[in-house]
UniProtKB/Swiss-Prot annotation:
Binding of spermidine, residues: 139-140, 262, 309, 335-337, 344-350
Keyword field contains NAD: yes
Name by which UniProt lists this protein: Deoxyhypusine synthase
Enzyme Commission number(s) of this protein: 2.5.1.46
Family statement: Belongs to the deoxyhypusine synthase family.
Biological role stated in the UniProt entry: Catalyzes the NAD-dependent oxidative cleavage of spermidine and the subsequent transfer of the butylamine moiety of spermidine to the epsilon-amino group of a specific lysine residue of the eIF-5A precursor protein to form the intermediate deoxyhypusine residue.
Organism field: Saccharomyces cerevisiae (strain ATCC 204508 / S288c) (Baker's yeast)
GO biological process: one example: spermidine metabolic process
Length: 387
């Protein structure tokens, strides 16, 4: 202690000059990127993420999210030949080894945005095993195949836009004509689906409802309807198209909460007295059964609300997910599910206590492209970890 400090009152010494405990050897030093160094120029996404891990705040959470995604992708269990028949219900890799079942959820605004192409990439290349989205996440994907969405501004006035037939999603603009084109496209499909439903009921009788787990049965569930839309749109820019082609189910428990709901409502008048029926119970059985069959379960939740809880609740059926990555801007002070951190889900049994989890507080559009570039699309081989 210096001479000056020795002359300070003891109270000041204790308050301001309090000694620290010894720093543990495993403490990580905060450090950012030194762009004056040659290796910091033209960095790959993987290198950038590695450097962000030690920056602190949400940059470190981005790094943690990438680590967890890599972990859920790398886990491997037994080979299918080592299993009894009743154990062969989960997901397997191309070599026949058990792998993590990855559930991805996203809100409709992300499909409206340019993140749609990132989400399509993940489904196109079979990097997720099931999807949960809201009605807008279904219809906006289809509508973008028919007409584009445009960049606007957050500050554009609602009255003026309404007069011009322009719908605003944040700083995006969707011409109302897009929804008119959507109606023209979807109504004939709904007509055909109703026809197939009626023919099936006539052939099999009322008991055909018992066969609703038959994927070819036109007793429609939301996921079956969405699969049909993906088949009908036949457009490689579409998430739904690739989900249909790769047999990846897209669940939407709120299918009527959007333009699709409007179309179904309009169709009730057109088809009356006949009605298209949609069974939500069939889908809750399907997604919960997927969770129960999973050898390990991972959640990638982009946004909040229904899509977040629907996946988390499915994971409750297996006593919790093994991995969880949340990305949203929700805060927990109001008790909202969107704002809740992973530890709250642990209390409900929706995430395992020993699970790897993180909540990244960020706008998905700003971080997901970077995260995907550093993980799913990095080009680096998956380091398969057998356990």
């Amino acid at each position: 202690m210096s001479d000056i400090n020795e002359k300070l009152p003891e109270l000041l010494q204790d308050a301001v000059l309090k000694a620290s405990v010894p720093i543990p050897d495993d403490f990580v030093k905060v450090q950012g990127i030194d762009y004056s160094k040659p290796e910091a120029t033209n960095m790959r996404a993987t290198d950038l993420i590695e450097a962000m891990k030690t920056m602190g705040f949400q940059a470190s959470s981005v790094g943690t999210a990438c680590e967890i995604i890599d972990s859920m992708r790398s886990w491997r269990g037994k080979h299918i030949d080592e299993l009894d028949d009743h154990e062969k219900k989960g997901c397997f890799d191309e070599e026949g080894y058990q792998k993590t079942t990855i559930f991805m959820g996203y809100t409709s605004n992300l499909i409206s945005s340019g993140v749609r192409e990132t989400l399509r990439y993940l489904v196109q290349h079979k990097m997720v095993d099931a999807v949960v989205t809201s009605a807008g996440g279904v219809e906006e994907d289809l509508i973008k195949c028919l007409a584009p969405t445009y960049l606007g501004e957050f500050a554009l006035k609602g009255k003026s836009l309404r007069d011009q037939g322009m719908n605003r999603i944040g700083n995006l603009l969707v011409p109302n004509d897009n929804y008119c084109k959507f109606e023209e496209w979807i109504v004939p499909i709904l007509d055909k689906m109703l026809e197939e439903q009626d023919e099936y009921v006539k052939k099999h009788g009322a008991d055909c409802l018992e066969a609703n787990q038959d994927v070819d049965s036109p007793i429609w569930t939301p996921s079956k309807m969405i699969d049909r839309f993906g088949k009908e749109i036949n457009d490689e820019s579409s998430v739904l198209y690739w989900a249909h082609k790769n047999k990846i189910p897209i669940f939407c428990p709120s299918l009527t909460d959007g333009s699709i709901g409007d179309m179904l409502f309009f169709h009730t008048f057109k088809a009356s007295p006949k009605q298209l029926r949609v069974d939500i119970v069939g889908d809750i059985r399907k997604i919960n059964s997927m969770s129960m069959a999973a050898y390990r379960a991972g959640m990638i939740i982009l946004g909040g609300g229904l899509i977040k809880h629907h996946i988390a609740n499915a994971c409750l059926m297996r006593n919790g997910a093994d991995y969880a990555v949340y990305i949203n801007t929700g805060q927990e002070y109001d008790g909202s599910d969107a704002g809740a951190r992973p530890d709250e889900a642990v209390s409900w049994g929706k995430i395992k206590a020993e699970a790897k989890s993180v909540k990244l507080f960020a706008d998905v559009t700003t971080v997901l492209p970077l995260i995907v570039a550093a993980t799913f699309a990095s080009g680096k081989p998956i380091k398969k970890v057998k356990n």
